[in-house]
Every structure is written in C-alpha cells, then in structure tokens.
C-alpha cells in the first residue's frame, strides 16, 4: 500500500514508487490517494483490501515531515511499527499498523517537507551555538537557557502561527528528488 497525494510533488513519493514497482504474483500495489481526492480514509481503503486479500505483509510508503532541517530528503526511514497518515502535518488519521490491520506493516518514510517553525528553531539553535563560541556574555543564549527543547519549539510555533499559519517547505528540486528516491525504493522492493 502507498500513501500520499500524487498531485502534490513532495507528497507523491508513495504514488511515484508504486508506479515503478513490478507487479508479480502475490505482490499487489495500491495508491489510495488522500481523503480530499477520494472521500475515503486511507485506513478504510487499506483495511478493506486487507480483509479481502489477507496479505502476509503490508509495505506502506509515505512522505514525512522532518523535525530537523538536515533530514529533509536525505534519509529513508524504515520501521516495523506502521505509520499514521497525515501525522507529520498535524492531520492525524487511523494508523496503518499490525494492531489495526491484523498483519505486519513495514513503513518506508522519506522526510520531504519541513515545518517553517522547525527551520526557525534549527536556525536559532545554530545562531545560539555560534554566538556562544565567540562571545562570553551571550544574551540570546541566556534568554533560552531555561527553556526545554519542546518549550522553545512551542514558543516559535505560537509566534509564527499568528502570522503565517501552518507552512511547510520543501527543496526547490523536489521533482528530481522524488524521482530518484522513488526509484531507489521501488528497485529495493523489486528485489524482494
């Protein structure tokens, strides 16, 4: 199974991968789309197929939202705990996992977008670090020294949400990146 919106390039890693997987006996592929396209929850579509086809394993492929700038488009994450569609952008849906579907779920996720708050947070962390290396009395560092990592992130989120709402950023060469990463993932699946 594949998750994602083929109409939005950074979220199209799943649908693009499925288009490259070689369909063989006992290997099924589906790109269920998103609720706005189909009117159906991804979980409901996948659950119906699982109940009918009784697969031994599900491989769910989806784009992720990174919590660190350096991870955007640089990693392919694998897990056997499933995936929750939409959770990276605050749009939680029913999880695709063993508990909900009754069979093992391998999730392949690629961080394709980063929240604007994460960019500000990571930039501030770097600024504070650089200033602390060059200044004895770093007033910016002192402002944030009592904040936990999550409290600092929440502060930036509250400030920015007032002005720009929920904004996600992706690299400018995202089309090429999606093609390359989809090919890597599909070639790996084709070797199974």
PLM feature spans:
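Catalytic-core regions of hydrolytic enzymes
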Residues: 33-58, 63-64
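A structural signal for small-residue-enriched, beta-sheet-centric alpha/beta enzyme cores
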Residues: 30-31, 61-192
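Conserved active-site and cofactor/substrate-binding residues in soluble primary-metabolism enzymes
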Residues: 12, 16, 41-45, 53, ...
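Glycine-rich phosphate/diphosphate-binding loop of Rossmann-like nucleotide-binding domains
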Residues: 1, 5-29
């Amino acid at each position: 199974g594949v998750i994602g919106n083929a109409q939005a390039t950074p979220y199209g890693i799943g649908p693009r991968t499925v288009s490259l997987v070689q369909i063989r006996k006992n290997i099924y592929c589906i790109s269920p789309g998103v609720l706005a396209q189909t009117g159906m929850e991804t979980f409901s579509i996948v659950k119906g197929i699982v109940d009918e086809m009784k697969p031994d394993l599900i491989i769910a492929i989806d784009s992720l939202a990174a919590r660190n700038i350096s991870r955007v488009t640089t990693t392919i994450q694998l897990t056997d705990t499933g995936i929750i569609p939409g959770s990276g952008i605050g749009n939680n849906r029913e999880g695709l996992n063993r508990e909900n579907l009754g069979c093992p779920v391998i999730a392949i996720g690629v961080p394709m977008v980063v929240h604007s708050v994460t960019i500000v947070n990571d930039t501030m962390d770097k600024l504070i670090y650089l200033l602390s290396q060059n200044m004895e009395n770093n007033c910016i560092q002192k402002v944030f020294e009592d904040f936990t990592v999550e409290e600092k992130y929440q502060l930036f989120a509250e400030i920015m949400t007032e002005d720009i709402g929920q904004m996600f950023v992706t690299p400018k060469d995202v089309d090429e990146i999606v093609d390359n990463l989809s090919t890597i993932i599909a070639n790996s699946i084709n070797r199974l």
